[in-house]
Amino acid sequence: LIFSSLTSVMPRSGGDYVFSSRILHPFLGWLESWTLVIASVLIIAFEVPLVLRNLQISARIIGIGAGGFHGANTWFTDATGTITGTPGFIASIIVLLLIAVVALLPTRTFHRVVTTLAGFGVACFIGMFVFGLLFTHRGSFIANLPRYTGGVTSAHIAQTGVKSGLIATSSSGFFSNIFSTTVFPLMLSVLLFQFIGFQYSAYIAGEVRGNVRRGVLIALCGALLIGVLANSVYVDAISSHFGFNTQVSWGGSYWGFNTSLTALPIGQPNSMPLLAVVANSSLWPLWFLISLGGVVFPFLLCPVYINFISRMQLAWSLDRQVPEWFGNVSERLRGPLNAIVATLVLTGIFLFFQSYKDLPTFLATTGHKLNLAGTAWFSIVMAILTWTLPGFNAILVRWRRPDLVRNAPFGKALPWIGLAWLVFPLWIYIFAVIKPIVNALKGGSALTYLETNGIIDAGIFYLIGIVIYFVMRYRAAKAGVDEKMLFTEIPPD
C-alpha cells in the first residue's frame, strides 16, 4: 500500500530511493538504496550456488527413478563435497554469464523472457503442491528412504533435530510464540530475506505505463501472495505431509543448525521433488520436470534483481549520487548498461570470496571465506533501512512533503499504515539482530560472532556508502549543483 501510494505520485525508476531522498533526506535515501544494492548482490551470489545445487538434485531424481547419475552429488564440488573451490567458482561464473545474457536483453525482450520463465516456475510450484499431495504418501516415503540414505531412517533424522535443540520438546501458546523475543523474530528475519525484491515493480515505476497505482499494486500484491504461498503454505503443507520434524531436522543439517546430523541424507537438502521421488519413483519424469522449476526460480531471480538494481543506479546518476556515466542508457537495451555490468562484476567478486579462502579472518563468515548462511545473514543486516524507511516515509510524508502527496491514494491513511508496518521490522531487528549482537558483545565470543554472521562486513559497507555520499556531495557542490532544488524535484521521467 505504501509503495503503490507513493509510486502513484512519484512514478519514477528508483523506488524507495526516490521516496526517501525527497521525503526524509538525500543521505538516508542514498544509504537505504546503497545497502539494498549490496544486500541484493549478496542475494544473487546466494542464489547462484542454489542453481547448481538444484541441477544436482534434478540429476539425482533421474538416478532414483531411472538409474544413473550416481556421481551427481560431486558435480561442481571440491574435495569437501561442497560447491566451492575452483570447480564451484567456474560453474558459478558460467551461471553468472547466463544470467548476464538475460540481464543484457533489450527491455521488452527481457520482460517477455522473465514472464515466460516465471510462468514455468509457478506452474512447477503448483504442480508440486497438487501432485505431491495426491500421488505420494508418508508411509511410502518412510519405507523407501533408508534405501537411498545408507540405512538412515526418517525417525533417526527427526531425533537428531531433538538432540540438537532444533525441534522443541514442549509447546507454547500461539500468542507467546508470536510475541517471542527469541526464535520467532529470527525466523521472521529469514523470511524477510526471502521477500527482498517483492518491490521490483515500484523500482521500475518509470517504465510502467497506464494506471501506475493499479499496475504497481497488483504486481506487488501478486509477488507477496506467491511469496507467502511458496514460503509458508506450500512448505508447511509438504513438510507435514512427509513428516514435519524429519524435514526440519534435515533442512537444519543443510544450513548447519542441526549439529547432530553431520552427513546430509542422500547428500542433498530436502528438496520437495527429491522427497517425492523417494516416495513414488514411478513418477520420476514429473518430479524431474518440477525440479527444473527449482533450477529456474533462483536463476530467474538474479536478472530481475540486476534489473531493479540498475534502475536505482540510474536514479543515483540523475541525482549526482554517482558519476553520470554510471547511468548512461544504452539505446539497444533501453537500460543503463554500465550499471548492469558493474552489478555483474560485483556479484562475481562475491562469488570468488564464497569459493576461495582469501578473506582476512575478521571479514570471513567461516574459514577465510563467505558461506551461504553467512551471506544470507550479511544480507539481512544490510537490509535494515530497506525494511524500516518505507514506514517512516509513510508517517512523515504529509508533513515533510505535502506537495507530493496531495492527491496520493490512501493519503490520509498513510501515517497509520506506516506505523502498523514498522511494528514488524523493528520487532525483528531489535530481537533477531540487535539483541544477539549486544549479548555477544557482553560475552567472551564477541569478535567471533561479529565475524561469522557478517556483521563486520556489513559495517564496512555502511562506512563505504557514507564515504561515497560525502565525496559525491563535495563534487556536486564544487560543480555548482543546486542540491536543494535537485532533491526538491523528482527525477526526470
What is the predicted role of each segment?
Residues 142-161, 175, 391-417, 435-493:
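Terminal cytosolic tails of multi-pass membrane transporters
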